[in-house]
Amino acid sequence: MDGGVGEEGKQQPHLVLAHKLFLLSHPDVDDLAKVDLRADVLAAVKSDDMASLYESLGAGGVLETDAALLAEMRGRIEEEIRKLDEKIADAEENLGESEVREAHLAKSLYFIRVGEKEKALEQLKVTEGKTVAVGQKMDLVFHTLQIGFFYMDFDLISKSIDKAKKLFEEGGDWERKNRLKVYEGLYCMATRNFKKAASLFLDSISTFTTYELFPYDTFIFYTVLTSVISLDRVSLKAKVVDAPEILAVIGKVPHLSEFLNSLYNCQYKSFFAAFSGLTEQIKLDRYLQPHFRYYMREVRTVVYSQFLESYKSVTMEAMASAFGVTVDFIDLELSRFIAAGKLHCKIDKVACVLETNRPDARNAFYQATIKQGDFLLNRIQKLSRVIDL
């Protein structure tokens, strides 16, 4: 299907393979599960004649290399490329521009299928040169983006997103524009820009058709996770907690509904239990895993800040009880977050009391005004010295 558009629930096979390769290298996946994963990876590699990947996996000790199988794969690839080149030559000699483009596209898709990254990108450029319609050019960008996500090539992804946006200045339909939002949202999430990812995902909830990247329930999982650390309570309620599209699916993802609703409803014991259940899913996600520790800190910052907003002072024991943890745990946690400037409070160790000292909006505005005034005064003084000279 052109542009790699996914049928409902149909993820792009190479992205399924990429996730399995990620799990194979993950220390938290047990050896028995890795036996099945290895078999799945080998079957996928053989099915698509991914000779270069097979060779590199063999060199890395992930798979055992069979020289005869590798030679068979390479032989089939050479034969198929010969046929594709013949079709291109025939189209150029006997057929129209549309058929020539289709023949070049077929060669591009074949290089993608067998996992020849550089050849695929080169052939996609050739195909683009034969392409006039903006929509078809966009489809080529989506193919490039999928290659980028398979290899986690963020430079390629970033450049392709910029290219797509420039193409949309020439035209383009809303369906493709909406799909691009999900691609960009995934890129933002994978590069730790959770706030922008949440915004793009929320914009795409009612128009989601990007099944080639991931199923809809995974999309909702990402949307909730990014929104929780990016939105204020009012926005979270309107856009996430009460969103019908999220309500329809959230129950399919273990712990996600309790995670979201217990946070919003200030049920902190339930929140910690649900959060603990979600950590495994976050750790085993190839896009989120590199940011696991960062995300854990951000979520705890949100929930501790929310709890403390209700008090001018509160005992450590009361807070520990609310979260279902020990006083020592809360003491250690808050000490770290206060030292890092994440929480606006101080600990009275003698009385075992937390005292909040967050600046209110008026105070924050006052401090900002003073800062800007000092900056302006310094500029004026520098200017006056220059004039005096």
From Swiss-Prot:
PROSITE patterns: PCI. Keywords: Proteasome. It comes from the Eukaryota. Pfam families: PCI, RPN7, RPN7_PSMD6_C. Residues 193-361 form the PCI domain. Signal peptide: none annotated. SUPFAM superfamilies: Winged helix' DNA-binding domain. GO terms for biological process: proteasome-mediated ubiquitin-dependent protein catabolic process. GO terms for cellular component: proteasome complex. Acts as a regulatory subunit of the 26S proteasome which is involved in the ATP-dependent degradation of ubiquitinated proteins. PANTHER family: 26S PROTEASOME NON-ATPASE REGULATORY SUBUNIT 6, 26S PROTESOME SUBUNIT 6. Belongs to the proteasome subunit S10 family. This is 26S proteasome non-ATPase regulatory subunit 6. It comes from Oryza sativa subsp. japonica. The gene is RPN7.
